[in-house]
């Protein structure tokens, strides 16, 4: 940004000053970028120019596209696939070792068993997301929103995984059928990336849980991230998750008979 009086400073031979703005994801390189720009301007103008970047950060909008949009999509898909693919096999392994049978004859209620399995699955999702976020931390502005997004996303993904693991008895069944709900969860995100969709799809997609999850990650990359703005998407993901756990508890109770 060229301030008033810049031309006069150049003509007087005094050190001129410019206001430089740096995108949030490059904030750690602000001083280096300013130094490079100062050298370039001094060569161009034959006079020293100081570029001030302190406090001048540019945040991406919550409807971000480009790299931020792609990162949000990747985070959503990794979260969904981790819970959706891994958890069914964890449940199947417990069926093979008869750990599940022991739990069913124990005093633990069906809801207790479901909560225990959900917590184990959520831990796996959290570990996977911690690794992914470690490589993308520079894009995150609101870590609180990211944590909430990961938690509700893990609840959704683990709910899908528990339902698949509880409903099938063999590894072949799990492998053959688990891909279908995962693809159904991934499809809205892929469609949203295409753009130019029919009006019907454009009206339906915002109600899909993976779209809401992606919106939460996008919001966390922006400077406008607040809990109030995140709440509708948080509630939407939770609303999709709740019926999954109700179904899992019902299946576990039937297995106990």
Explain the meaning of each model-derived region.
Residues 84-106:
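Transmembrane helix boundary and interhelical loop/hinge segments in multi-pass membrane proteins
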Residues 167, 221, 235-257:
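Junction motif at the cytosolic side of a transmembrane helix
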């Amino acid at each position: 940004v060229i301030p008033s009086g810049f031309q006069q400073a150049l003509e007087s031979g005094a050190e001129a000053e410019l206001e430089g703005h740096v995108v949030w994801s490059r904030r750690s390189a602000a001083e280096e970028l300013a130094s490079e720009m100062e050298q370039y301007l001094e060569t161009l103008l034959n006079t020293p120019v100081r570029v001030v970047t302190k406090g001048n950060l540019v945040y991406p909008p919550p409807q971000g596209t480009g790299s931020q949009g792609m990162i949000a999509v990747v985070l959503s898909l990794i979260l969904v696939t981790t819970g959706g693919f891994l958890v069914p096999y964890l449940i199947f392994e417990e069926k093979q070792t008869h750990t599940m049978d022991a739990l069913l004859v124990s005093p633990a209620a069906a809801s207790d068993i479901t909560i225990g399995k959900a917590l184990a699955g959520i831990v796996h999702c959290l570990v996977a997301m911690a690794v992914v976020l470690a490589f993308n931390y520079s894009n995150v502005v609101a870590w609180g929103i990211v944590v909430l997004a990961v938690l509700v996303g893990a609840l959704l993904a683990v709910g899908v995984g528990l339902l698949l693991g509880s409903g099938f008895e063999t590894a072949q069944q799990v492998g053959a059928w688990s891909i279908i709900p995962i693809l159904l969860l991934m499809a809205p995100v892929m469609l949203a990336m295409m753009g130019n969709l029919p009006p019907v799809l454009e009206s339906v997609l915002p109600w899909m849980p993976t779209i809401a999850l992606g919106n939460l990650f996008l919001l966390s990359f922006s400077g406008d991230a607040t809990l109030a703005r995140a709440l509708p998407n948080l509630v939407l993901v939770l609303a999709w998750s709740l019926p999954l756990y109700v179904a899992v508890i019902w299946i576990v109770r039937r297995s106990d008979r």
